[in-house]
A protein has these predicted regions:
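Eukaryote-biased, non-catalytic alpha-solenoid scaffold regions
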Residues: 1-193
Length: 193
């Protein structure tokens, strides 16, 4: 992979933006354009750029007023655009696993839930049923624990949608249905799987 200096990277520092959402929305659009241009000739490099942007989004946007919904919409559109770029990159399973580890860390660090939609794409991001099954096995014990009748609290885990998406992509449909039946609260986001 050739060395590449992403123009957007310096613009997405932690707390880089004030409270107004106009500038971050514009910067997200510019970053997407930059990544898509690179994707035409170097899909693996573009996928790496997509991961870098996803890692940087939430920390950079934490201080922005997102009450209008424009910022959330821009981030969701970015995820919708970036996921296929990451999926299409033809890489070794070990590199894809490292990418997923980085994305999982970004999801865990997502304090303002800007990139939570990424979990819905987890099965696609895994690309292979084997990798999806591996991630399902990672997430499954935690989901079962938070959905247990004995669990205290409200039963939230940032990896729930990623677990369900991984089970689906791995072809473990019966296991997915059994798990969904264990949910303490019946939410459409979980039951659609």
């Amino acid at each position: 992979m050739s060395a590449h200096k992403w123009q957007f990277a310096s613009r997405f520092r932690r707390h880089a933006f004030g409270w107004r959402s106009d500038t971050p929305v514009q910067r997200i659009k510019e970053a997407i354009t930059e990544i898509k241009q690179v994707a035409r000739k170097e899909p693996v490099l573009a996928a790496e750029g997509a991961i870098i942007l996803l890692e940087k989004l939430s920390p950079a946007l934490e201080q922005v007023d997102s009450s209008s919904g424009a910022l959330g919409s821009a981030v969701n559109k970015a995820i919708d655009t970036l996921v296929p770029i990451i999926v299409k990159a033809d890489v070794e399973p070990k590199l894809r696993q490292r990418w997923l580890e980085r994305l999982w860390q970004a999801l865990q660090d997502d304090e303002m839930p800007y990139i939570e939609l990424l979990g819905d794409y987890w099965g696609e991001l895994c690309v292979t049923p084997e990798l999806a099954s591996h991630w399902a096995d990672e997430f499954l014990p935690v989901v079962e624990s938070v959905w247990s009748p004995k669990a205290s609290g409200h039963g939230f885990f940032k990896g729930t949608s990623a677990c369900l998406a991984s089970l689906y992509a791995a072809g473990r449909h019966q296991e997915l249905l059994v798990l969904i039946d264990k949910a303490r609260f019946k939410w459409w986001n979980d039951r659609r799987w």
